[in-house]
Regions:
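His-Asp phosphorelay/catalytic-motif detector in bacterial-type signaling
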Residues: 45-47, 72-77, 104
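Alpha4 helix (beta4-alpha4-beta5 surface) of REC/receiver domains from two-component response regulators
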Residues: 61-64, 68-71, 82-103, 110, ...
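Conserved sequence signature across two-component system core domains
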Residues: 7-8, 31, 49
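Short hydrophobic/Thr-rich beta-strand motif most characteristic of the beta2 strand and flanking loop
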Residues: 25-34, 40
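Non-catalytic signal-transmission and effector/linker regions of two-component phosphorelay proteins
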Residues: 1-3, 108-120
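Two-component/phosphorelay signaling modules centered on CheY-like receiver
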Residues: 11-29
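Active-site beta3 strand of CheY-like receiver
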Residues: 44-50, 55
């Protein structure tokens, strides 16, 4: 069973997305902060990470976390999720943030599942 780590400070997102992905047969692990997510990566060894961009800790913490994760775990695909406005979001691209995919919230679950299956 493929493992997905969801890192998002929105508990509703963690619960809803986690439940939907579990129903698709994925093993879900979740963290409500970047720090907790970083701690889980080594113990869980996820096959893919869904990472929110905006955290209360720091405005660009999600982008920084993606780069840090890629430095330590270059083979784990990262999907960056954001609800920030399009102008700001498009100032960044996949290469800048070290992510395989960059998705705007609300994410269409069928599209997300298709993308996940393409990577794992």
């Amino acid at each position: 069973m493929s493992k997905i780590l969801i890192i998002d400070d929105d508990l509703d997102i963690l619960e809803t997305m986690g439940s939907l992905l579990e129903n698709e047969g994925f093993e879900i692990h979740s963290a409500d902060s970047v720090q907790k997510g970083m701690e889980l990566i080594d113990s869980v060894s996820p096959d893919l990470i869904l990472l929110d961009v905006m955290f209360p800790e720091k405005k660009t913490r999600g982008f920084e976390a993606a780069a840090e994760i890629k430095a330590k775990h270059p083979k784990i695909p990262i999907f960056v999720l954001t609800a920030i406005n399009r102008e700001y979001a498009f100032d960044f691209n996949k290469e800048d943030v070290k992510a395989e995919e960059f998705l705007n919230k609300p994410v269409k679950i069928d599209r997300l599942i298709k993308l996940i299956r393409n990577y794992i």
